[in-house]
């Protein structure tokens, strides 16, 4: 069970809820997420000291997850319901995720996933395009540490995205980081966490080269 809250540039807020558990022979989960603004100003074409009003823009998603392990391969499937709203316009849609992990041996794993394959209803005159993603990665796990490299194809970008990162754990402390690179963009993200019995406290950051600030969660 997990709860998260974050804030970023211009008052953007995000909140998340996660649950993981066992459902019969399968593993299951539920993810809820909200990202939004609540103080956008509506103004006319003429300069005024006060706005005509205020409105919000937000996105909400609810995702159900199930997974099952067959031999050395673990399969996962997710169904996601999405709602977007800005001013007086809204759009709803559905997306599917699929993933598989093959344990090559005791240390190496090969991962493949297809994310955000679905569609949205029209938002005013056109439907929002979901960022369809195909991600492949190889990870190396040893005791309390893990390293990985990955490559991603994204329908909204012409160039591939490359990842390299890792994480480690020492007693009740765990930490990790990831470097991401594609044409015109590079970023570094990381975080630390502390286990307190059944509770976990985490702090994360992401730093990019678009100078949009440093989001924290």
Model-assigned labels for residue ranges:
Residues 1-217:
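Subset of outer-membrane beta-barrel
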